[in-house]
């Protein structure tokens, strides 16, 4: 069988990469698909990653986006028989690796290729939180009608995509999932490798569901510092003792508020337990919104793509608290937990 892999720098088995292990064992690996950040995981968020060849092995790296509607081209799809997926996700609707997997599942359904997911734990797999995506906001940072924190592994999510017929034209693909051993949704799994340049450690990964929304505002969330997604601030925020200055660094070449002294809040000293207890905490965004007093100039339209619904911005502008907003999506969370149950491979 001719094998293509969908993976990146996180596809490690011990200290060896899946690609090297397959080649050592004489498997016929003919192509690599790489997601956002590239196969070696060093490209900036949203940066264009072109097709190339893996320097170490000579296996061609194919673009996910060279065909129509953000799918691989027919020529790419004809090169292989089975797609092996091995990539570390962080379990959030706006983290793009799952959307790339879904596009590949769709292409495999169309061209009758098998898909095999080598499952990995979800470091945010112990809870479900956030509104279900209103599909009028479907985008590269929101591809499925799921909550912001869906609490599923990529294997479980793949099964759900097939079972709920979420692929375009209700297609399903020939899917097999190899589950993780000794894993439950309450297993706290610390990632051995940062999944992307701005999620360097577990603190960033745990705070990401609460701080990512700053991407849709003028506020810096610490890109270009040692604490991405763990701090927030802006040159015009007042009354804070903490400050930081974003710099140009690998993985954040041109971060928001580059070179400017930002005043704000450092969340990096919060305990993991406190972060888990709060789940998605909109109080940080609300705090910055009220402090900057920019009214309509605070949120860009990208905010709705991230949060997935139109009522959150409205409620923040009406002066509602984080708790009041969270109460509004409670039903979404309960509904989704019931809907996903048939697809769970691991104990909740």
What spans do the regions from the language model cover?
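Glycine-rich, charge-decorated loop segments at or immediately adjacent to ligand/cofactor-binding or catalytic sites
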Residues: 41-46, 116-138
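Conserved anion/nucleotide-ligand pocket segment
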Residues: 137-210
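Glycine/threonine-rich flexible loop motifs
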Residues: 89-101
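Short internal beta-strands
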Residues: 28-38, 118
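Glycine-rich, aromatic-lined ligand/substrate-binding cores of catalytic
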Residues: 181-258
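Glycine-rich oxoanion-binding loops at beta->alpha junctions
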Residues: 50-80
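Conserved functional hotspot residues or short segments at active or partner-binding sites
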Residues: 228, 232-330, 348
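N-terminal phosphate-binding or glycine-rich loops at protein starts, especially the Walker A/P-loop
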Residues: 1-27
